[in-house]
Amino acid sequence: MTYHNKEKQEVLQELNVQEATGLSSSEVKKRREQYGENRLRAKKSKSNWERFADQFKDVMILILLAAAAISFVVACVEGDPEGFFEPLLILLIVVVNAIMGVMQESRAEKALEALKSMSAPHARVLRDKAESIIDASELVPGDIIRLEAGDFVPADARLLQSVSLKSEESALTGESVPAEKDAGACPKADAPLGDRSNMVFSGCSITYGTAVAVVTATGMDTEMGKIANLLEGADDGQTPLQKRLAQLGKYLGILALAACAIIFVVGLANGLEVMEIFMTSVSLAVSAIPEGLPVIVTIVLSIGVQRMVKKNALIRRLPAVETLGSASVICSDKTGTLTQNRMTLVETYLDGETQANKLETKPSEEVKTLLRLGTLCCDGAVVFDGDKEQHIGDPTETAIVLAAHKNGMPKESLAKQYPRLAELPFDSDRKRMTVVCRMDGKLVAIVKGGFDVMEPLCTSGNLSQARLVMEEMSERALRVLAVAYKEIDKIPDEKSMMTLEGDLHFCGLVGMIDPPRPEAKAAVARCRKAGIKPVMITGDHVVTASAIARELGIMREGDRALTGAQVDAMTDSELDEHVESIAVYARVSPENKIRIVKSWQRKGQVVAMTGDGVNDAPALKAADIGCAMGITGTDVAKGAADMTLTDDNFATIVDAVREGRGIYANIKKVVGYLLGTNIGEVITVFTAMMLWHKTPLLSMQLLWINLVTDSLPAIALGMEAVESEVMTQKPKPKSEGLFAHGFGVRIVLQGVMFGLLALFAFMIGEKSTGTVAGGQTMAFAVLALSQVIQAYNMRSEHSLFKIGMFTNKKLNQAALLSIVLVLAVLFTPLRIPFGMISLSPQLYLEALGLIFIPVVIMECSKAFGLIKHQH
């Protein structure tokens, strides 16, 4: 139900309450039973045990558990104590992986808690004809409340009385200037939140004036509660990387099960023992599953997070790193994100001039006079504490005060030099403020207000030219105030104070704006170069938003600007049809923001949303990646976001995109490296079983290769430096698979190469030693060491000679350690539990020659253009 479009008496009648008496205690009790407490509902979060259980839903993990179970059964049947080592190792790997998953996913749901903390703890209420202070949670619709400057609004309420009332609503509406309120106003039913001047909203604060209001909504029914509902409803979803890895796991699982089934049938048909077939199946399952992949991807993402922290971007969810690299649209809030969230005086106009001029570093005496008069007619103040500024009061006033201060006229000094003797405070009816000061022995009345209300009060000055200048400044989204004055003989009595506001001399205009951040324009240009479309979504007026967007390069020729009301009038299909041509959305609601984000998502785009207010939180959560501001951002926005920009610098998001793209490229290298080796292992085990009914590699040997030998170089690959050209490429399409542009084919071919190499090594080893164990030892040595060397090939699609063979120091260290671990198994008693034997020096030399074959083949492929660098 809406109340802003109804007269006061009608609202009181609907809520069945009288302004003079308030609700009775019995009525309050009934309504509390009906509406509940004035609190926001908490969303139940998963326990760590539930999160731990969720880790075991992955297909790859389930297959590993099945392999462990089979190994355990075989060990029990055979009664071999050493046989239990293998299932215990697999189980340990699975549990460690699950614990890491819980650690990364278990983040507290802070958004709703932060919304709760914004609720007012107490309220001044009228009940049973008596005024009292109660806990805000006890309010019910129909309660009569009193508000004054400094109060938090405890619930949504319709104003009944107001005196010079202003409310800070930027968290809800995105407007940087406190909203003027008027109990007598009656906006239209479809008026956006920021235009409902006869309403105050829960969680906002009163910055000026006093009021009496009737509560219209409490708890989850308030505007803040609606946002809480949206936060609950917004789906966290999966990132593209999560979806692709999950899909990969399913494919590998199906492949492993199919191969195991074939081996089982072939083994039985050839009269092999069931236990031997089981153990071969376990080996095949282990070879098909890249056990270390989930953990290594997590580690690579964690490394990326550490890099981003150094660039002032704090990641809350690891997969968000990859999503950011895929971002193709950035929907950005204006206030505090693209702009400084601080009104600044940028232009002045003096009576008699032809146009407005930018405020110079060293202004003329006439401009100083304008600033002096304007400052004397301000209640706002700026307090300096070292390099920090604290702005107190109305932002337009603090802009004037700060401009005067920077030009050698601190307000404190002016107040002492020209003491204020009388005043007429600003109110919403007059829309102006008047003071009387003693200046150089004379009494001077100074009046400040909007030009439209000041023009009829002035009898001297070129007002027609001033109006033209004012209109031109307003078109450029400047907030314009006029300053006028007159000398008086004496201060009139209280009844005649209004006579001060007449027969004035027009002095000039001051133009203020919440200016763009200095670095924002360059950041927008870098986004466009990277193929990312910037879109402004704000609660501010469309003229202001469009002006800022044009200045920053967000809005270009042919682009459109829409209001929230226009978005409401469009169906989803209509919005989808026009969304690509709309650069600015103004006066939008939280629901509008979510619709805009989802419209882009339906277009197949990966959407990043930046913001700092409560009103941004639902869209931050609905977007593929939400980026909150760390300094000016509310706790609600930070709780809903995936990433926080700790310096509130819009340009930081561009650096984060660059890192995200680099990290995705590194993850792709890691996936390619691990899958290439796994495919080689599958081909080795499957082919040997089909052709010779033998197992060329035991499951223990495969686990050592996958989890020890391969994992260290894979992690180092994930630390590869970001390639220079990443920010000149377009974002990869949302539908683009992990194996696009022939990447999957190359992985399979590499797997075939490793498979043939291992089979050849097995044949040589078995023939030379006369034992299967000799063949397995030879296959292990060649496969393990050649895969370590292969990590260097995977660094880039450019030749190793072009990028420098040993320029990745982390990879050099990882490769050296992996080689040491392989040699430890080959040349120490550790080889015994791994089922290997000592080979002759001749065989070791032959193995050494075989391990460099992949390097030669890959370098030749790069040289002949078979592997092309993808732009």
Give the role of each language-model region.
Residues 1-728, 738-739, 752, 780, ...:
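Conserved cytosolic headpiece of P-type ATPases
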Residues 77, 746-761:
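Alpha-helical transmembrane segments of multi-pass integral membrane proteins
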Residues 604, 657, 661, 756-768, ...:
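Alpha-helix capping/termination and helix-coil
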Residues 689-700, 762-775:
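Helix-coil boundary and interhelical linker segments in multi-pass alpha-helical membrane proteins
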Residues 709, 754, 777-791:
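Generic alpha-helical transmembrane segments
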Residues 733-752, 772-777:
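Membrane-water interface at loop-to-transmembrane-helix junctions
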